[in-house]
Amino acid sequence: MHDTTRPDLAYRRVVALTAALFLSYLSVAMALPAVPVHVVQGLGLDNAYGGLAVGIAFLSTILTRGRAGAWADRLGGKLCMQRGLVIYAAAGVICLLASWPGLTAGASYTVLILGRLLLGLGESVAMVGMISWGIGLMGHARSGQVMALVGMGMYGAFALGGPLGLMLLDRLGFGGLMAVTAALPLAGLVAIHWLPAVAPQAGKREPFWRIIGRIWRPGAAVGLQGVGFAALGAFFSLYFLSRGWPHAGLGLTCFGVGFVLMRLLGGHLPDRIGGAPVAIVSLAVEACGQYLLWMAPGPYAALAGALLTGLGCSLVFPAMGSEVVKQVPPHLRGTALGGFAAFQDLAYGATGPVAGILADSWGYSFVFLIGGLAATLGLWMAITTRRVEGDAAA
């Protein structure tokens, strides 16, 4: 573990990993808006099929987090991340084959679904592998900083990938876009080849659900945090349009500014003062942002709510993730982090359809009341996490 004694070198190496993850995660982000457009306009299928093609990748990610964590524990973070990037590239190739001119719409859609399922597996394996590898390089005491960097790479890819994906779809067509998504992970694979591996830790393995039993409180907190982000991403523009307010497109911008600003300024805080205190304050800020969105009298108050939501959401994942790392031995770290991330994945996947049903009956503002209540419940879970930690220390 010589790398952990040279923090500047270890940090630079994890920044290089973050850059590779950003480059590779563009494969996910660029496809996100392009896939439903291709399914509906290119294949002539219904909107429901377009939504399924997007959502199936996230379902695959949720279902494979445990397996990805077990790979990271058994094989080491570097090999796990490398496998994830290869799977990314293979998924891009399969989605490229879905654009083959000789295929019927049904056959093309079937091939596309297979590629999207594989993409979800790749996302799961690559992210868990990188977190495990990064913590191995920087040390247990800086696990929160590692997870903050991972989030910056992923959300940065989302911010750039959406418009870039639509631009490439317009200029290159769906096949050309999928070729790019297959090439980017290979570039990331080359970029991380020179970085040193960290040997996996020896120790007795435990069943996945037993590990979940150890970490469910921080997992629930991060999942409840994700409700507000998912609600904002899905319904902010519709909320503004229903009220006749201007600047409907600035909601995610304000969220992103708050999110990135807090990651840059406070990414070190979970390691310095503890994950639970950071999560408690963060979830309180997110709840305030969601309640402000719910009660907003005008567009600028709502935009301020989006900014507060971004500030609040930013550090919950690394803060609660650092608590997870404390609660399991090193040889189970990857499995625990995989299960932990699945809580957030589940929140992202379930919030859209559930909140949509509620919005149909109660209006779009009601969605943000639900987000505020979820963040408040998450705040309570973070408080109980701190109490459990204090009892264990006593």
Task: Set out the residue ranges of the language-model regions.
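Hydrophobic core of transmembrane alpha-helices in multi-pass small-molecule transporters
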Residues: 22, 107-125, 301-315
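Helix-to-loop junctions at the C-terminal end of transmembrane segments
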Residues: 64-77, 262-274, 359-360
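C-terminal membrane-cytosol helix-exit motif in multi-pass small-molecule transporters
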Residues: 182-201, 381-386
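C-terminal ends and interior cores of transmembrane alpha-helices
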Residues: 86-105, 285-297
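Cytoplasmic helix-loop-helix junction between adjacent transmembrane helices
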Residues: 115-153
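Helix-loop boundary and gating motifs at the non-cytosolic
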Residues: 13-53, 58, 221, 229-239, ...
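Residue-level signature of mid-helix packing/kink "hotspots" within the transmembrane helices
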Residues: 58-66, 158-159, 256-264, 348-349
